[in-house]
């Protein structure tokens, strides 16, 4: 039985107990959430992973994405990035390579970390078709499903599968047009294949077969968003919403068949449309776990898109987004390096916490309360321990060490907190 089938029968599994303990919740709450399709716990019969729950009522989680490109195939660097992402506090990792030996590279990455690992199988199928036949449009349907199964057997825990691109979705995209084009690689691959071959998307047309593969290998389905906007002026357009409708329908169908499902959301969304996107997705999908790629709230800040994303992600999480994909400073510019990955993870972790302060104030705000008290008391060791990046906080202060060890060089002898502590009591 799958974990969904266990949950529907009233069985509380060991994974549910682990998530409940980690979140400070009752195991029965986790069981009910999985049974209803509102919570997922990625696992695998092929490898032991760090158990992590995603969904309503749980802390907002952060995914880090890595992977070689056709220009840069440095396997050791990708392994280092995976290890660094886990150390920096990522909850999951997606290996999205588009070059080299697909299965060999993914195996090395999977073996290097304990996190749940996700993938996009159609990348492998389409790119291997381009190598073999000279063009992505000559991929066969069997090659697509074979790539999916091969990646599942490696121990991949969740997969972004572009089920929401069908002929209706594609018609809406072409009729409406886009200011920023189509930014999803998976969407570009699949739509080009469909138009050239004049055929329906195999992942949509053969959805029951896809579910069989994923169930057999206990892979969580993440409904890919190939029609997401690549520019804020295209956000929440007809093609995006059409894909959301289809993805919500297939998500419901998959869950009924015992599969865990995540629904993916858009990547470029202006601030005033975030609440609409989150609420629309939650209602349409029956409150499935919602995974947003970013989102980026402006398009004018290449080199600083991790900051742009932090703004959007914190608002998204506050409205109910459950799962955030990080964005690095290299977004739209280059393949991220090691430092970009670390920065992306930490920035998104901050955003996730900010969102949780609104979503779950009784749980999330204690961390900030403890930091406020430590600052009042000028307890630097406590402040370091509470910082989201203790090593960085300590290093910054030590790089400009104060004469007065109670204070910092911003205020020196005229530290407001120290002056008040010496003259009257404000403790609360």
Curated annotation (Swiss-Prot):
Q: What is its EC number?
A: 4.1.99.17
Annotated residues that bind [4Fe-4S] cluster are located at 408, 411, 415
| Cysteines paired by S-S bonds | none
Tell me the first and last residues of the signal peptide: none
Keywords for this protein: 4Fe-4S, Iron, Iron-sulfur, Lyase, Metal-binding, S-adenosyl-L-methionine, Thiamine biosynthesis, Zinc
Q: Which domain of life is it from?
A: Archaea
Q: Which Pfam families match?
A: ThiC_Rad_SAM (PF01964)
The UniProt annotation places Zn(2+) binding at 268, 332
Q: Which pathway, metabolic or otherwise, does it act in?
A: Cofactor biosynthesis; thiamine diphosphate biosynthesis
| Protein residues bound to substrate | 94, 123, 162, 184-186, 225-228, 264, 291
CC cofactor note: Binds 1 [4Fe-4S] cluster per subunit. The cluster is coordinated with 3 cysteines and an exchangeable S-adenosyl-L-methionine.
Q: Which GO biological process annotations does it have?
A: thiamine biosynthetic process; thiamine diphosphate biosynthetic process
**Record's function text:** Catalyzes the synthesis of the hydroxymethylpyrimidine phosphate (HMP-P) moiety of thiamine from aminoimidazole ribotide (AIR) in a radical S-adenosyl-L-methionine (SAM)-dependent reaction.
The similarity annotation says: Belongs to the ThiC family.
Q: What is this protein called?
A: Phosphomethylpyrimidine synthase 2
Organism expressing this protein natively: Methanosarcina acetivorans (strain ATCC 35395 / DSM 2834 / JCM 12185 / C2A)
């Amino acid at each position: 039985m799958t974990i969904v089938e266990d949950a529907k029968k009233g069985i509380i599994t060991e994974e549910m107990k682990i998530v409940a303990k980690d979140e400070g919740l009752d195991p029965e709450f986790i069981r009910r959430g999985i049974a209803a399709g509102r919570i997922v716990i990625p696992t695998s019969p092929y490898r032991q992973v760090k158990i992590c729950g995603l969904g309503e009522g749980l802390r907002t989680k952060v995914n880090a994405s890595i992977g070689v490109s056709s220009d840069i195939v440095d396997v050791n660097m990708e392994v280092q990035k995976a290890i660094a992402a886990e150390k920096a506090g990522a909850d999951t990792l997606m290996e999205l390579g588009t070059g080299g030996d697909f299965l060999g590279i993914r195996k090395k990455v999977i073996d290097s970390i304990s996190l749940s690992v996700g993938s996009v199988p159609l990348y492998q199928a389409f790119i291997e078709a381009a190598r073999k036949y000279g063009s992505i449009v000559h991929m066969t349907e069997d090659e697509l499903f074979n790539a999916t199964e091969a990646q599942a057997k490696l121990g991949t825990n969740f997969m972004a599968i572009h089920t929401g691109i069908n002929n209706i979705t594609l018609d809406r995209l072409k009729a409406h047009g886009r200011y920023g084009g189509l930014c999803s690689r998976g969407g570009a691959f699949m739509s080009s294949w469909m138009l050239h071959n004049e055929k329906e998307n195999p992942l949509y047309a053969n959805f029951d077969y896809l579910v069989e593969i994923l169930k057999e290998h206990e892979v969580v389905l993440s409904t890919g968003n190939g029609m997401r906007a690549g520019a804020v002026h295209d956000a929440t357009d007809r093609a995006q919403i059409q894909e959301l409708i289809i993805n919500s329908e297939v998500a419901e169908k998959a869950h009924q068949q015992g599969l865990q499902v995540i629904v993916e959301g858009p990547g470029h969304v202006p601030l005033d449309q975030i609440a609409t996107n989150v609420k629309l997705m939650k209602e349409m999908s029956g409150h499935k776990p919602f995974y947003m790629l970013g989102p980026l709230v402006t398009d004018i800040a290449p080199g600083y898109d991790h900051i742009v994303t932090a703004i959007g992600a914190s608002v998204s999480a506050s409205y109910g987004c459950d799962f955030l994909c990080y964005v690095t400073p290299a977004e739209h510019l280059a393949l991220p390096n090691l430092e970009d990955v670390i920065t992306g993870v930490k920035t998104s972790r901050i955003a996730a916490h900010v969102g949780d302060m609104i979503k779950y104030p009784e749980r999330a705000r204690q961390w900030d309360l403890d930091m406020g008290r430590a600052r009042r008391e000028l307890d630097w060791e406590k402040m370091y321990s509470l910082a989201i990046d203790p090593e960085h906080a300590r290093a910054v202060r030590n790089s400009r060490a104060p004469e007065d060890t109670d204070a910092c060089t911003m205020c020196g002898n005229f530290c407001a907190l120290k002056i008040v502590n010496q003259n009257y009591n404000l403790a609360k």
